[in-house]
């Protein structure tokens, strides 16, 4: 039995390594690129190899360490294949050691209209269960495994329904001033099942979240900023550049410190603040022994920027 388990483990390990190697190798073809405005065309789309990406998902690598994920919705309907493709890219972000942060944006005039495509989602709506998918991280974060690396999102136009829940799952959020938000599932005979009943309430407060979820009313980028849902509001067309600016700052910071910061905050949400408090000093002691911590002092002494390696 042990030999069978070992062989299964080896096959799974090789399968994951092959997936990462194929996808990362394709990403490397993009090289290092400079920031691009949203109305400009970046380098040609990078073929993803295995697994195949939906036609409406575009991926590029920026500066070697930033994963750019561009989605294009041809209609307000969200197909299951698009969600699975995005989830596999988030898995890549977490498991490729050279990637430090992701940026999610839209290639079209709208982010995501957010109505689930009835045909492709029929099995999920019938069984109440998401299909088991290998090398996948749920984009809205409602089931484990959860994303471990930072994600910045840039939105414009419609950011509604499932699109708003995808937006809420990001760590830092940028919106163009023309963004129209909505969480109006109650007007279509169901409810926000992609995490908004938890994340929207947590981010904006009970009354603010319920005011929009129970009525289905739209709200603006300025209102989203007032509610604390958005960290930056930009003129239309500048939201992606701002998101990349934020991502670049994250990418040069110490990866171990970034991970510990996210872990601590998430532990407080999932396990309570006492558990998060208890883990603070042990985690600090662990990071104090890291090479990145020593690199900070070396860089300080040598009067240069630190080059953190995540070790």
List the predicted regions and their residue ranges:
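N-terminal secretory signal peptides
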Residues: 1-14
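N-terminal export leaders
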Residues: 14-26
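Terminal low-complexity tails and localization/encapsulation signals of metabolic enzymes
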Residues: 19-22, 36-52, 298-311
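Conserved CoA-thioester-binding segment of acyl-CoA-metabolizing enzymes
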Residues: 38-105, 109
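Crotonase-fold acyl-CoA enzyme core
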Residues: 49, 143-256, 295-298
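Glycine- (often His-adjacent) and acidic-residue-rich active-site loop
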Residues: 51, 85, 106-146, 159, ...
